Amino acid sequence: MTTIGENKLTEMPAKIQKGVYAELPKLLEYVKAGAIEKEMGVSSGWISMRLNRTQNGKYSVRKFNAADMAKLNSAIWKLAEKLMVVNVPYSPDRATCSAYVKISLKDVFVSVLAENKLGWTKTELAYRTSTGASMKYRPQFTEEDLEKLTIGVRELAVRMMSYEYFLDQE
C-alpha cells in the first residue's frame, strides 16, 4: 500500500499539477501553511516538503497526488468557511477587541492582511493583539481598523475558495 504523497503526479491532469505549484505558494503568502496542515491532520512541513525544488530545479520526490489534493482542497475550503463568518465587533475596551481578534484569527493569522488592508507594518496586528503590563501604551483598535480587518478576512476567504475552483478546472 502506497503512502499518501508518495505517488507520482501522473495521477493528476497537467493543468492541475501546474496550478498546485503556481498557485499554492501565492496562497501561502496570505495563509500560514501550518493552519492548512493542522486542518488536514498532517505533520508540520508536509506542504513545504512537496513544494520544495531540488538543486536541479525539479520538484522533490514527495509530490502531491490526487488524494493529497482532495485533502488539501478540503482543508482550504474549511478554513475559508471559518473566515467567512468572522465579524469583529468594535468595543472601546481594547483587551476585548484584542481577545476577539486572537480567537477569530488564531487558526489563520495573516500579517500580509494587516499590511494590505489596514496599512500597518508586518508586526502591527501582533503588536495590537498582544497583552502585558504595557498594553495601555500600545496602539488601540479603532472601529475603522476592525471594519477593514473584517473585510480583509472575507476577501482572504474568497481568495482561498477561488484557489480550489482554479484547481478543479480542466
Identify the residue ranges that each predicted region occupies.
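DNA major-groove recognition helix of helix-turn-helix/homeodomain DNA-binding modules
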Residues: R62-L83, P139-M161
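A short, Lys/Arg-rich alpha-helix, primarily the initiator
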Residues: T2-A33, W77, V85-F109
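Short, charged recognition helix plus adjacent turn
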Residues: T10, Q55, E81-I103, D107, ...
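Short alpha-helical "recognition helix" segments of helix-turn-helix
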Residues: K32-M40, V108-L118
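Short, charged/polar micro-motifs that form catalytic or ligand-binding hotspots
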Residues: K26, E37, R62, I103, ...
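Recognition helix of helix-turn-helix/homeodomain-like DNA-binding domains
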Residues: S43-F64, T121-F141
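Secondary-structure boundary/capping signal
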Residues: K32, S44, A80, T121-K122, ...
